[in-house]
Amino acid sequence: MKRLIIFDMDGTLYSLNAVLPAVYEIQIDFLNLKKGWSREKIEAYFNDNCVFPFVSEKSRSATALFQSEGLDAKEWNDFREARFPFDAVVPSPTVSKELMDDFDKLGSCVLVTSNSRKNAQRILDKIGINVASFDSIVCDDTTSFNRPFCKKDIFEKLLCDYSMRPHQSFSIGDRYSTDIKPLLELGGNGVLVAAPESLSGVVGDMSNGKLMTCDAYRYFPSEGITSESLWG
């Protein structure tokens, strides 16, 4: 059976624990520069919009938030690229080319991230994953969609581009609202991972047709889809 497997990057392919506090400061600095808001106002605004300095499955994209404020996407990408804490990006010992090859055997693999292409490339290099591991990569500065950055729109186009029915698609990510819910709304499947180390269990269970909710990940099946139609 054909499958479309869509990966998030930050928090999914590598841990954000050491990266997120520094990225949060970059986001504060950018909004202070563009809006002139105080730190207290920015922190309250971020909290109201689920942009946090810590890992949370409720987190949402600061990039999409900035674009909804009318801030220039390229200016934000340039600002972030110049300050991103690449030294804090730590590869997971279980996320490897071999792991991605195992996913590739199950279907077409696509990376969707609100990072710029340059940032995404540097992060993938740091964690030892080749861009060739993905059939395509969609970044904030490579998508032609209207702003703000919207994963649901991107997922819908990917289903069309790869000639997939929704139940043949799987979104794998660490944030429910941003990575999982948009594809569920289109009729697809979601796999919410607890950490990058969860991916080895996901690919094993997908290979055996036994995705489930467990300590490592939570599986959100396409509504009304049977195991026979998913794995037959």
Predicted feature residues:
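Acidic, Mg2+-coordinating phosphoryl-transfer loop and its flanking beta/alpha structural elements
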Residues: 172-209
